[in-house]
Swiss-Prot record:
Source species, domain of life: Viruses
Domain RNase H type-1: 454-585
Catalytic activity: DNA(n) + a 2'-deoxyribonucleoside 5'-triphosphate = DNA(n+1) + diphosphate; Endonucleolytic cleavage to 5'-phosphomonoester
Residues engaged in binding Mg(2+) 1: D117, D192, D193
DNA-binding region as annotated in the record: 807-862
Entry EC number(s): 2.7.7.49, 2.7.7.7, 3.1.26.4
Lineage: Viruses, Riboviria, Pararnavirae, Artverviricota, Revtraviricetes
Record's protein name: Intracisternal A-particle Pol-related polyprotein
Site (Cleavage): A592, A593
Cofactor: Mg(2+)
Note: Reverse transcriptase/ribonuclease HThe reverse transcriptase is an error-prone enzyme that lacks a proof-reading function. High mutations rate is a direct consequence of this characteristic. RT also displays frequent template switching leading to high recombination rate. Recombination mostly occurs between homologous regions of the two copackaged RNA genomes. If these two RNA molecules derive from different viral strains, reverse transcription will give rise to highly recombinated proviral DNAs.
Cofactor: binding comment: The RT polymerase active site binds 2 magnesium ions.
SUPFAM superfamilies in the record: DNA-binding domain of retroviral integrase, DNA/RNA polymerases, N-terminal Zn binding domain of HIV integrase, Ribonuclease H-like
Transcription regulation in keyword set: no
Length: 867
């Protein structure tokens, strides 16, 4: 097939200069063209000839190539697609230039509209000439009977990652003369959709031809059949009328909801509609739970009864959904409602201007309701400034003035809200039928859990252990129970639940678990939103019991503090602790004699083990439970985090804040636990996308680790980051929530890095004024200049095998009572060594020193390895 040459000449922009694309590398990428059937090849030839006539492509001899293919649309016509994924990987992506869809209720009430659509916007915007060879493709010839015809795009191709952003920037630049010529005109732009709005129709009639002329000069043409000139029109999926905005009718189909991808699309549509809907977030949770589980887009999902009921609520709400157009001369208010589980808010001016909802998946396991209201109010204030350019004059919340003062004194979120909002805070809602949906909910304010001990309340001490034994002490009586749990926190929660059910009178609870104390204090006015969490069910039961009982005071006492157990707050806790550890269970004469021996001689754990045929763990527990012996136990070294025995085995990662870096204050830090090599990235946030960016930068510099340990931050536990780790074949582990000791190595690295930034700033501030440069200098010092006791830097340790003891030992297999060795020591630890067992035969059946093995290992360094 030979294309016909055409001179029809697609006229690229007469004014606009093509924007160059930033590239990571200039190396050509060649992906061979896929095989196409004769039917598809014929369609490709026809579509390419059309693009050639329109001037969208040129013949090419580019060293780049990526495949093209065609798909048949429902109408029966073919669509040409270009697989540009390899090219997208080579380019630096532009940042977002538009934060989201414009809120149409911000359009003034009663103004006239003109709505237009730019025709073939991508194909009207030129590519920079130096970038065009990268977007080349090939039309294969049948049976290779002639050279293949090759072409490259002259305009923005579909499928290029930067095409949407470049389109927005290009059209925005083309509209600048219109904005300057008619400053009183409201002009909304989203991709290729444009809305003009003005109070006077004559002004629109003057602006419209000027707009057409300007767009034409930039090579942009409008679709004349889609122009809407009226006070009512369709724009961005909504019907805009003089006094209200109504979403277009959306049909929710249920027959195709079978996979995760189906639900992702459905929930995307619902999320787009949420500003129109007054449905509280809690009523949509059965739908958003479908996003959990298997992350593969084709993983099966089944529509449940609760999810179907949620869809029915959405359909019912859509029938009456509308937003009011704002009246510029009138003020508006922000109303925050006490809806079930999580609050709901609305910007109000004789009707809803914009519904505001909290995040469907909060970062915390327990959301305290008063804090959730303050956070949503702050979100509403930000939305008012963003979309309407001014703050509401009135904030309406479900709390009295006295309650607001109490919350401002005890809650950080309320303190920020009260000090940042200059208007009036009230609790009287407008009288309107739309707002009646929230009036049936009771005001959520803490009344059961008090902040001071109850003088007339009984005192109960609780404790739980990892053996599943939970106990509480009341009036000197010890009650213990075995639970089917192996987590001390879970057992402690179950014990507290048992106490709340048993003692209905005013109650003081003393627990040695700070986690449980904080949880109980939050649960009366909070909500657990993690159905996948094991503790969520227990929290819900505790919450139900709290809401139907007398006041409770719960406090924390530190266990094993070394203080005399005669102290009032410690005697009961000591009894509960002994009950969970077996200290109160000695009853037989033999056990009594053993206790006398223990309390008299205080011998070592090894002696107890040999004397009473105990295991090592049981013997050590006896020593640690002894009040006299525990004071003299060896203190473990602070560096108890698991470390890799060689580089790239175990990394730790965390985020610290350096306020002097400004917008780049979120400093992501990774450290290799074996070599100590450190990498840091100053970024603008700490979301999953920022964490992934840091990982890619760190791994490209120092290599990819096998295991990555982080804390339980929302970015690290997100589905997006978990999927990234699986794709990169990196095992991701998290530590205990709210326990930074599990990431002690990277926490110490934070302090070290900040120390060097401060020290070097004094000497190098004039030479290295930029934050990135000062950070690089600190990392260079830590990685390449600082040496250990052996004279090695972190970079040298990272790039070489760690030194191992050159020793051989014999060792005994206690299961078979046989001695083996001598075998080499891999690594020494405190009280133990790791030995590499060189077995007599290998997994391949060769003898240890056989000729076959010698042939297989020829040229391989003589280091221990598994065979």
């Amino acid at each position: 097939w030979k294309p016909r040459q055409t001179g029809s000449g697609f006229s690229l922009a007469a004014i606009g200069a093509a924007r160059p694309i930033p590239w990571k590398t200039g190396d050509p990428v060649w992906v061979p063209q896929w095989h196409l059937s004769s039917e598809k090849l014929e369609a490709v030839i026809q579509l390419v000839e059309e693009q050639l006539k329109l001037g969208h492509i040129d013949p090419s001899t580019s060293p780049w190539n990526t495949p093209i293919f065609v798909i048949k649309k429902k109408s029966g016509k073919w669509r040409l697609l270009h697989d540009l994924r390899p090219i997208n990987e080579q380019m630096n992506l532009f940042g977002p230039v538009q934060r989201g869809l414009p809120v149409l209720s911000a359009l003034p009430r009663g103004w006239n509209l003109i709505i237009i659509d730019i025709k073939d916007c991508f194909f009207s915007i030129p590519l920079c000439p130096r970038d065009r060879p990268r977007f080349a493709f090939t039309i294969p010839s049948i049976n290779s009977d002639e050279p293949d015809n090759r072409y490259q795009w002259k305009v923005l191709p579909q499928g290029m990652s930067n095409s949407p952003t470049m389109c927005q920037l290009y059209v925005q630049e083309a509209l600048l003369p219109v904005r300057e010529q008619f400053p009183s005109l409201i002009l909304l732009l989203y991709m290729d959709d444009i809305l003009l709005c003005h109070k006077e129709l004559t002004m629109l009639q003057k602006a419209y031809p000027f707009l057409l002329k300007t767009l034409s000069q930039w090579g942009l043409q409008i679709a004349t059949e889609k122009v809407q000139i009226s006070d009512t029109g369709q724009f961005l999926g909504s019907v805009v009328s003089p006094d209200k905005i109504v979403p277009q009718k959306v049909e929710i189909r249920r027959d195709h909801l079978h996979t995760l991808n189906n639900f992702q699309k459905l929930l995307g549509d619902i999320n787009w509609l949420r500003p129109f809907l007054k449905i509280p977030s809690a009523e949509l949770r059965p739908l958003f739970w479908y996003l959990e589980g298997d992350p593969h887009i084709s993983s099966p999902r089944t529509l449940t009864l609760a999810a179907n009921q949620a869809l029915q609520k959405v359909e019912k709400a859509l029938q009456n959904a509308q937003l009011q157009a704002i009246e510029d001369s009138q003020p508006f208010s922000l109303c925050v409602f006490k809806t079930a589980q999580l609050p709901t808010a609305v910007l109000w001016q004789n009707g809803p201007l914009l519904w505001i909802h909290p995040n469907v998946s909060p970062a915390k396991i327990i959301d305290w309701y008063p804090d959730a209201i303050a956070q949503l109010a702050l979100k509403g204030l930000k939305a008012a400034i963003t979309h309407f350019g001014r703050s509401p004059y009135l904030l309406i919340v479900p709390y009295t003035a006295a309650q607001v003062q109490t919350l401002a004194a005890t809650s950080n979120d309320w303190a920020v809200l009260v000090t940042s909002f200059s208007g009036k805070i009230d609790n009287h809602y407008p009288k309107h039928p739309i707002l009646q949906f929230a009036q049936n909910q009771s005001v959520v304010f803490p009344q059961i859990t008090v902040r001071n001990p109850l003088k007339n309340g009984i005192v109960v001490y609780t404790d739980g252990s990892k053996t599943g034994i939970g106990a509480y002490v009341a009036n000197g009586k010890v009650v213990s129970k075995q639970y089917n749990e192996n987590s001390p926190r879970m057992v402690e929660c179950l014990v507290v639940l048992e106490v709340l059910k048993t003692f209905l009178e005013p109650l003081n609870i003393v627990s040695d678990s700070c986690y449980v104390v904080n949880a109980v204090n939050l649960l009366e006015g909070g909500w657990s939103d993690k159905p996948s969490s094991r503790v969520a069910n227990i929290f819900q039961q505790i919450q139900l019991v709290l809401l139907s009982r007398s006041p409770v005071y719960i406090t924390h006492v530190r266990a094993h503090s070394g203080l005399p157990t005669s102290a009032p707050w410690l005697s009961g806790n000591d009894l509960a602790d002994k009950a969970t550890s077996g200290g109160c269970s000695l009853s037989s004469p033999v056990e009594a004699a053993q206790e006398i021996f223990i309390t008299t001689f205080h011998v070592t754990a090894e002696h107890y083990r040999s004397r009473n045929s105990l295991t090592r763990k049981e013997a050590r527990d006896i020593v640690t439970q002894c009040q006299s012996c525990c004071e003299f136990l060896p203190v473990p070294h602070v560096g108890i985090n698991p470390r890799g025995i060689r580089p790239l085995q175990v990394w730790q990662m965390d985020v610290t804040h350096v306020s002097s870096f400004g917008k780049l204050q979120y400093l992501h830090v990774s450290i290799d636990t074996c070599s100590g090599i450190m990498f840091a990235s100053p970024l603008t946030g700490e979301k999953a996308s920022h964490v992934i960016q840091h990982c890619l930068e760190a791994w490209s510099a120092w290599g990819k680790p096998r295991l990555l340990k982080t804390d339980n931050g929302p970015a690290y536990t997100s589905q997006k980051f978990q999927q990234f780790c699986r794709q990169m074949d990196v095992t991701h582990l998290t530590g205990l929530p709210y326990n930074p000791q599990g990431q002690g190595i990277v926490e110490r690295a934070h302090r070290t890095l900040k120390t060097y930034l401060i020290k070097q700033k004094r000497e190098l501030e004039e030479i290295l004024p930029q934050h990135q440069e000062s950070l690089s200098m600190a990392l260079f010092t830590l990685n390449f200049l600082n040496i250990d006791v052996h004279g090695h830097t972190a970079a040298e340790r990272q790039c070489s095998e760690p030194d191992r003891p050159n020793e051989m030992v014999k060792w005994k297999n206690v299961l078979h009572n046989k001695w083996y060795g001598p075998d080499p020591i891999l690594i020494r630890s405190r009280g133990a060594v790791c030995v590499f067992h060189r077995m007599k035969t290998t997994h391949f059946g060769y003898q240890k020193d056989s000729p076959e093995k010698s042939r297989l290992t020829k040229g391989i360094p003589d280091v221990p390895r598994l065979w």
